[in-house]
Swiss-Prot record:
Homodimer. InterPro entries: Adenylosuccin_syn_GTP-bd, Adenylosuccin_syn_Lys_AS, Adenylosuccinate_synth_dom1, Adenylosuccinate_synth_dom2, Adenylosuccinate_synth_dom3, Adenylosuccinate_synthetase, P-loop_NTPase. SUPFAM superfamilies: P-loop containing nucleoside triphosphate hydrolases (SSF52540). The lineage of its organism: Bacteria, Pseudomonadati, Pseudomonadota, Alphaproteobacteria, Rhodobacterales. This is Adenylosuccinate synthetase. It comes from Cereibacter sphaeroides (strain KD131 / KCTC 12085) (Rhodobacter sphaeroides). HAMAP family: Adenylosucc_synth.
Length: 430
């Protein structure tokens, strides 16, 4: 029995929510290990739609333990709102079903204010942040001045933490022309929210290791995608945390030996939200068609996603950096009806052919895609549950992707419904 890490292998929005939900039915523990409430995921269960952005996907399934690990930055007010919304939808949530790492860093109102002020004043090169304070919260974590969940339990400690934080933030705010932090108002907000958060606070590292020793199945749920990784993504147009599979261990306090299978979620084409390089991007009728058919709008922000053909170079790269064992290929049905499909198989930069994306941002921006054309199909793949249900051209497309990314397909998703899935390799089996 293997513990499974699910990571997005593109720029996020690959359909992780459905796959995680599909796997979570058989998992005992579902843990988030990085990010914040900036990455939304949509679940469709028995026709009912759930939109989550902070809580693990397993929260909607009774009898599962959902975990928010120390690698996550936590907005406590958003947490309470998301819990309330799910409860209104009939989902039962208690400290028995949800656990939050005591050492998880809090996102405060001042983080969102700083995030938005920087983005609005940075006219030269906007990063495309959601403005929710995730980046500034991670900055405070690395700067060793953050307020953590455990700090909410002691008022004296909390006051000291706020004072230390204000020294840094008030200086920043002066430079940006923002009013200083209202110390008493912030403390009052934290005191008010503390009783609603602390019941869920636990030593996650300890519980996770106990679960592992007891033979429980653990599913590690990543947010966003590996191309947004702070180290291996398209820097600086990235998120503020590590997104690749290795972060699952660091972000929950469990050893890397606990990871048995890494499942990379890959869309059958490519999308990106916000700024940054996108070599295979389409700015024509085909790109519009992909966006309309795939309903490519962000779960959290509602922003229209940029669309392009499948980029095998990037996915091969992310499969390597995350040690992907197999991929789940999603949204194949969006390609139904295209007469011709294209796959990016390399880049050209200054007259030289490359088999990887260079690390320098200026070089990334100058890369032009080298495409390989494949025959499309007119038949529908929507709802297919076996290889026999797929048109021959669709099977060839999938097989070509496997060859180019040097990684096998473990799952194939053919609609948002969780049961419309073709299983090739069971990630939970050793």
């Amino acid at each position: 029995m293997a513990n499974v890490v699910v990571v997005g292998a593109q720029w996020g929005d690959e359909g992780k929510g459905k796959i995680v939900d599909w796997l979570s039915e058989r998992a005992d523990v579902i843990a988030r290990f990085q990010g914040g409430h900036n990455a939304g995921h949509t679940l469709v269960i028995d026709g009912k739609v759930y939109k989550l952005s902070l809580l693990p996907s397993g929260i909607v399934r009774p009898g599962k333990l959902s975990v928010i690990g120390n690698g996550v930055v936590l907005d406590p007010w958003h947490l309470v709102q998301e819990i309330a919304k799910l409860r209104a939808d009939g989902v039962e949530i208690s400290p028995e079903s949800l656990m939050i790492a005591e050492n998880a860093v809090l996102i405060l109102p001042l983080h969102g204010e700083l995030d938005r002020a920087r983005e609005s004043q940075n006219s030269v090169a906007k990063i495309g942040t959601t403005g929710r304070g995730i980046g500034p919260a991670y900055e405070d974590k690395v700067g060793r001045r953050a307020i953590r969940v455990a700090d909410l339990a002691d008022e004296a400690t909390l006051a000291l933490r706020v004072d230390r934080l204000m020294v840094h933030h008030d200086a920043l705010r002066r430079g940006l022309g923002i009013e200083p932090v209202d110390r008493e108002a912030l403390l009052a907000q934290l005191r008010e929210i503390a009783p609603q958060v602390l019941p869920y606070a636990k030593p996650v590292w300890k519980v996770m290791n106990e679960m592992r020793k007891a033979g429980k199945r653990i599913l590690f749920e990543g947010a966003q995608g590996a191309l947004l990784d702070i180290d291996f993504g398209t820097y600086p147009y990235v998120t503020s945390s590590n997104v690749i599979a290795g972060q699952a261990a660091t972000g929950t306090g469990i050893g890397p030996g606990a990871i048995g299978f890494v499942l990379g979620i890959v869309k059958a084409y490519t999308t990106r939200v916000g700024e940054g390089p996108f070599p295979a991007e389409l700015q024509d009728a085909d790109g519009e068609r992909l966006g309309e058919r795939g309903r490519e709008f962000g779960t959290v922000t509602g922003r229209k996603r940029r669309c392009g053909w499948f980029d095998a170079v990037l996915v091969r790269q992310t499969c390597a950096t995350s040690g992907v064992s197999g991929i789940a290929l999603t949204k194949l049905d969006v390609l139904d009806g295209f007469e011709t499909l294209k796959i990016c198989v390399g880049y050209e930069l200054d007259g030289e052919r490359l088999d990887h994306l260079p690390i320098a941002a200026d070089q990334q921006a100058r890369c032009t895609p080298i495409f390989e054309e494949l025959e499309g199909w007119s038949e529908s793949t929507a709802g297919a549950r076996s290889w026999a249900d797929l048109p021959g051209a669709a099977v060839k497309y999938v097989r070509r992707i496997e060859e180019l990314i040097q990684c096998p397909v473990a799952l194939l998703s053919t609609s948002p419904e969780r049961d419309d899935t073709i299983l090739v390799t069971d990630p939970f089996e050793d």
